[in-house]
From Swiss-Prot:
The lineage of its organism: Eukaryota, Metazoa, Chordata, Craniata, Vertebrata. It comes from Delphinapterus leucas. A ubiquinone binds at H201. This is Cytochrome b. Heme b b566 binds at H97, H196. GO terms for cellular component: mitochondrial inner membrane; respiratory chain complex III. Heme b b562 binds at H83, H182. Disulfide bonds: none annotated. The cytochrome bc1 complex contains 11 subunits: 3 respiratory subunits (MT-CYB, CYC1 and UQCRFS1), 2 core proteins (UQCRC1 and UQCRC2) and 6 low-molecular weight proteins (UQCRH/QCR6, UQCRB/QCR7, UQCRQ/QCR8, UQCR10/QCR9, UQCR11/QCR10 and a cleavage product of UQCRFS1). This cytochrome bc1 complex then forms a dimer. Gene3D superfamilies: Cytochrome Bc1 Complex, Chain C. Coiled coil: none annotated. Belongs to the cytochrome b family.
Length: 379
């Protein structure tokens, strides 16, 4: 008798995606982050759903409703902090996933890569509107500052900002629509994840060598299901440790003060996962220039497949490119650090140099290094 998982229309799809999927036999733990991102998404949707049952998207009660969740709702505090720190874990996995794809040349699968970049943008949008919901000081001023950047667009800027706000300032209408977006976006992300996987399974997974592995594959289950479960356990352990011991480690103390339009916090800054882009924005003294650089700092990922000049897919056997890749990672960390510092000397200069290096590495140095490596290998 034929196995039901191979004949049933629905089971067949799941079987071909998670059970009998031919997978390269040599993929390392860096390939775990895709499944971890799926786990993060599920956790965020579930915790978010329970939070939405008790949250009220109204300027007069939003802050109190979050306090009510933490104080009065059964296990509300852990749901709230799992959701807040879950977002941080989500971005750690996202950035690692992107870094792995860059290192091993996964961006040569262009459709998968482009949908991945779109997913990154949507997760960033979701995190931004979500940060506004507790209606603390940093929520309010973060929303004001970031939405205000759109006013740099010539001709339509101011109208666009007022349209997004639903008035002449960040107020009740803004909070309501941000809650709506925060609720709907994760479901759109889930649909895009399915498309991301669809395109990935068209070509099959890449592997550390970057060489086609069609002749050396093993079934996904049980080998990689076990490996993914180990990764999932480590992720959950880390998340629970942070949530139970230092829940506010990655948050901002200013957000425990209710939003006050008459009092600006000393240092307005976003959550840690946006700090690298925030530094690039601050590094340019011109408003429109800063906004364009901010956009380009993320959209530059779309140009990476076009900048692939190496004849080898992976960086595994390319020491020069490896050096530049790790320089890029260090630069990303420096940008993140600078974003959390006040706008004063020497942070301004360091931020500007790190911003220049960021674009220089991706657009010039890495493609040139690849060409040099081609020459050295007489390719």
């Amino acid at each position: 008798m034929t196995n039901i998982r191979k004949t049933h229309p629905l089971m067949k799809i799941l079987n071909n995606a998670f059970i009998d999927l031919p997978t390269p036999s040599n993929i390392s733990s860096w390939w775990n982050f895709g499944s971890l991102l799926g786990l993060c998404l599920i956790m965020q949707i579930l915790t978010g759903l329970f939070l939405a049952m008790h949250y009220t998207p109204d300027t007069s009660t939003a802050f109190s409703s979050v306090a009510h969740i933490c104080r009065d709702v059964n296990y509300g505090w852990i749901i709230r902090y799992l959701h807040a720190n879950g977002a941080s874990m989500f971005f750690i996995c996202l950035y690692t996933h992107i870094g792995r794809s860059l290192y091993y040349g996964s961006h040569t699968s262009q459709e998968t890569w482009n949908i991945g970049v779109l997913l990154l943008l949507m997760v960033m949008a979701t995190a931004f509107v979500g940060y506004v919901l507790p209606w603390g000081q940093m929520s309010f001023w973060g929303a004001t500052v970031i939405t205000n950047l759109l006013s740099a667009i010539p001709y339509i800027g101011n109208t666009l900002v007022e349209w997004i706000w639903g008035g002449f300032s960040v107020d009740k209408a803004t909070l309501t629509r941000f809650f709506t977006f925060h609720f709907i976006l994760p479901f759109i992300i889930t649909a895009l994840v399915a498309v991301h996987l669809l395109f990935l399974h068209e070509t099959g997974s890449n592997n550390p060598t970057g060489i086609p592995s069609n002749m050396d594959t093993i079934p996904f289950h049980p080998y990689y299901t076990i490996k993914d479960i180990l990764g999932a356990l480590l992720l959950i352990l880390t998340l629970l440790t942070v949530t139970l011991f230092t829940p506010d480690l990655l948050g901002d103390p200013d957000n425990y003060t209710p939003a006050n339009p008459l009092n600006t916090p000393a240092h307005i800054k976003p959550e840690w996962y946006f700090l690298f882009a925030y530094t690039i924005l601050r590094s340019i003294p011109n408003k429109l220039g800063g906004v364009l650089a901010l956009l380009l700092s993320i959209l530059i990922l779309l140009f990476i497949p076009m900048l692939q000049t190496s004849k080898q897919r992976s960086m595994m056997f390319r020491p020069l490119s490896q050096l530049l890749f790790w320089t890029l990672i260090a630069d990303f960390l420096i940008l993140t650090w600078i974003g959390g510092q006040p706008v004063e000397h020497p942070y301004i200069t360091v931020g500007q140099l790190a911003s220049i290096l960021y674009f220089l590495l991706i657009l010039v140095l890495m493609p040139v290094a690849s060409l040099i490596e081609n020459k050295l290998l007489k390719w």
